C-alpha cells in the first residue's frame, strides 16, 4: 500500500491518496482539485473518506463523482476492494470526527483529532472537551508503533503522542 500526502489550501491541509493495485482511497480532499487529480493519475478512485466536515477538509469534494463519496462511515470494520480498515469515532475537535485505522499496516489517519505534538482544537464550532478526553482514552489503548497521519503537519507515532495525552486529561 502506498500513501501520498498532498498539502492543499491556505491552511495546509493534508489530503491523502492511499493506493494499491491501481485503485485508491482519498482522505480529506480539502482544496486544489487539480493538484489532487494530478496525484491520482490513472488510479481508480473507489472511495473518498472525510475525517470531519470542516471546510478545509472538504473543499474539493464537489468536483468528485458522487458515487465514490462516502459521507458518513459508521464505526466498524470495512473491506472495500483491496482495502481493509476500521472507522473509530473520535469526537472532540468536531462531533463528526473519525479516525481511519488500517490495522494490518499499523497506520491511522486522524484528521484534526491528533497532530504531531498536539491534539485538535476544541474551541471551534462542534468542539467538546469531554468528547476529546473520551476519544483520547479510546485511542490510548492502541499500539505505540502505529503511525499517525494527521490532517495538518507531519506524521508521528502514536506512542510519542500518548506521552502527552495526560496534559489534556
Pin down the residues of each PLM region.
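Active-site metal-binding loops of divalent metal-dependent hydrolases
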Residues: 29-31, 53, 92-94, 106-107, ...
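Active-site HxH/HxHxD metal-binding segment of metal-dependent hydrolases
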Residues: 12, 24, 29-86, 164-167
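Divalent-metal (often Zn2+) His-rich catalytic cores of metallo-beta-lactamase-fold enzymes
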Residues: 107, 131-169
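Conserved beta-strand hairpin/beta-sheet module of binuclear metal-dependent hydrolase folds
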Residues: 1-40, 99-111
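Residue-level signal for the nucleotide or nucleotide-sugar donor/cofactor binding architecture
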Residues: 85, 126-127
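Active-site environment of divalent metal-dependent phosphoester hydrolases
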Residues: 33-34, 53-59, 95-97, 115-117, ...
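Short glycine-enriched, charge-decorated loop/helix-capping segments at active-site entrances
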Residues: 120-126
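Conserved catalytic scaffold of divalent metal-dependent phosphoesterases
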Residues: 74-78, 83, 93, 107, ...
Amino acid at each position: 500500500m502506498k500513501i501520498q500526502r498532498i498539502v492543499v489550501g491556505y491552511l495546509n491541509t493534508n489530503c491523502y491518496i492511499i493506493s494499491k493495485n491501481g485503485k485508491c482511497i482519498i482522505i480529506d480532499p480539502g482544496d486544489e482539485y487539480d493538484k489532487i487529480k494530478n496525484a491520482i493519475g490513472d488510479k481508480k478512485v473507489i472511495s473518498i473518506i472525510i475525517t470531519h466536515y470542516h471546510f478545509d477538509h472538504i473543499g474539493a469534494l464537489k468536483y468528485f463523482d458522487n458515487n465514490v463519496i462516502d459521507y458518513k462511515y459508521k464505526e466498524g470494520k470495512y473491506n472495500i476492494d483491496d482495502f481493509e480498515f476500521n472507522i473509530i469515532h473520535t469526537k472532540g475537535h468536531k462531533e463528526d470526527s473519525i479516525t481511519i485505522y488500517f490495522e494490518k499496516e499499523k497506520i491511522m489517519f486522524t484528521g484534526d483529532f491528533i497532530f504531531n505534538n498536539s491534539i485538535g482544537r476544541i474551541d471551534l464550532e462542534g468542539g467538546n472537551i469531554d468528547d476529546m478526553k473520551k476519544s483520547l482514552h479510546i485511542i490510548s489503548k492502541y499500539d505505540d508503533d502505529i503511525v499517525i497521519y494527521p490532517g495538518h503537519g507531519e506524521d508521528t507515532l502514536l506512542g510519542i503522542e500518548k506521552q502527552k495525552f495526560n496534559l489534556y486529561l
